[in-house]
Amino acid sequence: MYPTVAMVHNVGEKRRKQQLNDRPYFLCEYAHAMGVGPGNAEAYWREIYRYDSMMGGCVWEMVDHAVLHKDGSYTYGGDHGEWEHDGNFCVDGLFYPDRRPSTGADIVRFLYRPIRVSHLSGDRFEVFNTTAFSMNRYELTFRWNDGSVEVLVPDTPPLSRTEVR
């Protein structure tokens, strides 16, 4: 659990070079949603998408652990007279106790976006369809801020990349 990005990269490289078995590599946990979100998760997903042997991973943890107090506030870690502890691991989920999404949920939703766009150079961009489905259900258009160019992105097959100019 919690391998570094460099470790994930090394596993991907070794599998690409057939120095490891060809089973999919799954990160059972690679990020913790404490604070404002899962931290360096984008770097992990760059590595996951770089190698065919990568399968994805899980973020800990889904929902805050807190108790709704009769005054409407949420309580946790030492608020009920129990033995004091560090209290760092109760209100740290992607969703608040009432299931509203936190900032961390927005970050994860962005990480799992179905289409990724990268600037290659000049007027060249790469569109990456991260899903197992065709992009034909989407209409994706590039528009430059000055309105000078508008490009309709062609259908991109599942798990494929298309260059757009």
Placement of each model-derived feature along the sequence:
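Sterically constrained small-residue positions within well-ordered secondary structures
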Residues: 18, 48, 118, 133, ...
